[in-house]
A protein has these predicted regions:
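Class I SAM-dependent methyltransferase Rossmann-like catalytic core
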Residues: 1-19
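Conserved alpha-helix/loop element of class I SAM-dependent methyltransferases that forms part
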Residues: 17-33, 50
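Class I SAM-dependent methyltransferase SAM/SAH-binding core
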Residues: 38-40, 44-92
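A short acidic, Gly/Pro-enriched loop at the edge of an enzyme's catalytic core
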Residues: 91-102
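A short SAM/SAH-binding and catalytic strip from SAM-dependent methyltransferases
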Residues: 101-114
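A short glycine-rich, Lys/Arg-flanked "PGG" loop and its adjoining helix->strand segment in the class I
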Residues: 116-131
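Conserved catalytic/acceptor-binding region of the Class I
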Residues: 133-202
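Conserved Class I S-adenosyl-L-methionine
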Residues: 186-262
């Protein structure tokens, strides 16, 4: 698996912002005291820690493929005594069958060459009366105002790179189909969105994407593999900052969501 975004500070900045409230509200009612939860692809662990606070005293486990990110998650969660972080492989989870009440993954399947296989493995470690809960964005459904033609170029570039890396940037719309292919028959599909429209939210969202387009793994791959020149990437960054500075700027990120019962 290639994680297209990489782990530049501009990427982790957005990951650290994520909580149950803004990223897992669709399954929040399952995070009750005593529930055993596995957070797959946990990144720096802010959602994981939020879950841990809700299910205490039960321990929560967060896994990620990146050892560096797991080390950071452990540092950031120091003082939280009911959370464990470990490196792990979503295709070969190191847990017995029927181990968890909730197996959760946020923005993970879009980066995997075999999302159906990952869902099958998540299903294996889920208890018979538990759920597998997945949320992924749908890049083709991103919507913004005002029109900024260079952002159209940015979106096409990112989707091209993500697919070159074996992922599916429009994963949100495929989640239900992938769940059915993985053998789930009882699936609750929903959708929700992040909206960035206040001056503060626009500045945060625009700046992190501007930084990504000049400094993250996406930018490095774009130059290395001739998807874009440095000048083109800098123009994309400038377009993000123009959008963020516009008093009427508005950006919506659509997410598909599924709650699957084994």
């Amino acid at each position: 698996m290639t994680y297209t975004h990489g782990h530049h500070e501009s990427v982790l900045r957005s990951h650290r912002w994520r909580t149950v409230e803004n990223s897992a509200a669709y399954v929040a009612s399952r995070f009750v005291p005593g529930a055993r939860v596995l957070d797959v692809g946990c990144g720096p662990g802010t959602i994981t820690v939020d879950i841990a606070n809700r299910v205490a005293p039960r321990r929560v486990i967060g896994i990620d493929a990146s050892a560096d990110v797991i080390d950071q998650a452990r540092r950031d969660a120091s003082g939280v005594d009911n959370v464990d972080f470990a490196t792990g492989d979503v295709y070969a989870l190191d847990f017995p069958d029927s181990s968890f009440d909730v197996v959760h993954a946020h923005q993970v399947l879009q980066h995997l060459p075999d999302p159906v296989g990952a869902l099958r493995e998540m299903r294996r470690v889920c208890k018979p009366d538990g759920v597998v809960a997945v949320r992924d964005s749908d890049y083709a459904a991103f919507t913004w105002y005002p029109d900024e033609p260079t952002l159209d170029v940015w979106l096409a570039l990112y989707r091209n790179i993500a697919r070159t890396n074996g992922g599916e940037p429009d994963a949100g719309r495929f989640l239900l189909a992938w769940a059915h292919a993985a053998g789930f028959s009882d699936v609750e599909p929903t959708a929700s969105a992040w909206c960035f429209a206040t001056p503060e939210d626009r500045a945060w969202w625009g700046d992190l994407w501007a930084d990504r387009m000049t400094s993250s793994a996406v930018a490095k791959q774009a130059e290395r593999d001739n998807f874009a020149t440095r000048a083109e990437l800098e123009e994309m960054a400038a377009a993000w900052r123009r959008w963020a500075a516009h008093p009427d700027g508005w950006f919506a990120v659509l997410h598909g969501e599924i709650i699957c019962r084994p």
